[in-house]
Regions:
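Histidine- and acidic-residue-rich, metal-dependent catalytic cores
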Residues: 1-148
């Protein structure tokens, strides 16, 4: 039986560069998004995802917050509690990220994982407020890894 830790994923250098820029923009330590991509890959393997589906999940993990970077709002990096208006504005970032992923030529699957990576099982997430099994497993896996 193959260990879920033993298989290290290989990531596209362009996506790693985008992830590094997003990590720096948000004030995360270097390699934050790569670690999340490795985590979702391990979880995808544990859930018996096909290699192609694991690749989509890895790609989504690397570009999940590109929408925040493209919004380029100072409050994202402020470290303070956001106002109601700022929170509402920030909730647009998954849709902006979905559009950016499309412009980059990433698959529709990656685009949708990026769009739904802030959805919650109880329907309180954003941008669409979908709930339960309406949220694809890949998006749920990314939500957990990103929160962890």
């Amino acid at each position: 039986m193959q260990s879920i830790i033993s298989e290290k994923p290989r990531f596209d250098e362009k996506l790693i560069s985008i992830a590094a820029d997003a990590d720096a923009f948000e004030g995360y330590s270097a390699g934050h998004s790569v670690r999340i991509a490795e985590m979702v890959d391990s979880l995808g393997l544990a859930f018996n995802f096909e290699p192609h589906d694991r690749l989509l999940l890895q790609q989504a993990a690397l570009v999940r917050n590109i929408g925040e970077m493209q919004m380029n709002r100072d409050y994202i990096r402020s470290g303070r509690v956001l106002s109601s208006e700022e929170r509402l504005d920030l909730q647009r970032h998954p849709v902006i990220g979905e559009q950016a992923a499309a412009k980059m030529g990433l698959s529709r699957g990656v685009q949708l994982i990026v769009r739904w990576h802030h959805e919650w099982w109880n329907g309180s997430g954003y941008p669409d407020g979908i709930e339960g099994d309406q949220i694809p497993l890949a998006a749920r896996i990314l939500r957990v890894a990103d929160t962890y």
